[in-house]
């Protein structure tokens, strides 16, 4: 079952299509401004969610696609600024998301337990919420944009295949245990992130140097 929503639709309300197991694809019109909480939660056969290129949607609200376990790829529209908590929680087949340059906040657990294989975060992103990418076990390398001021705890914790996280600046706040001990933080020597690695006994690799320091 494929649903093309009316071109005049502005809002999809809370749980509007939740637990609709026959839904395979949905097309969102440019007029859509609000994608409500848990709107498509537990649509376990949803394969595609397509936004119009000129979509006015600015926020993917809490749990909007929670447990859409067959959703594989997503292109978010240009005006999206916030991805709400658990928006894509347990989307186990979600391999790739293309983020817009307008994105400012990824809230808590937004992509927890997803199948993401790569992560290209946009410059302009300000905040990464708690456990935002917790147990995304297919991620290997991540670069944090220099615009990010807040990295909450456990952002990449439990990502067992994650090899490196590169942080080339000093965010205003970095919470505890953003990565596993098996992961290497790439940072500048003498930076706050260097001291953070000391505090949590994390491996680090200095940018511009060849050696890895193990504490």
Regions found by a protein language model. Name each.
Residues 202:
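Short glycine/serine/threonine/alanine-rich loop segments
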Residues 1-11, 21-34, 44-59, 69-82, ...:
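Structural signature of tandem-repeat unit edges
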Residues 13-16, 36-39, 61-64, 84-87, ...:
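Consensus positions within tandem repeat domains that build extended binding/scaffold surfaces
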Residues 18, 66, 89, 134, ...:
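A structural signal for leucine-rich repeat
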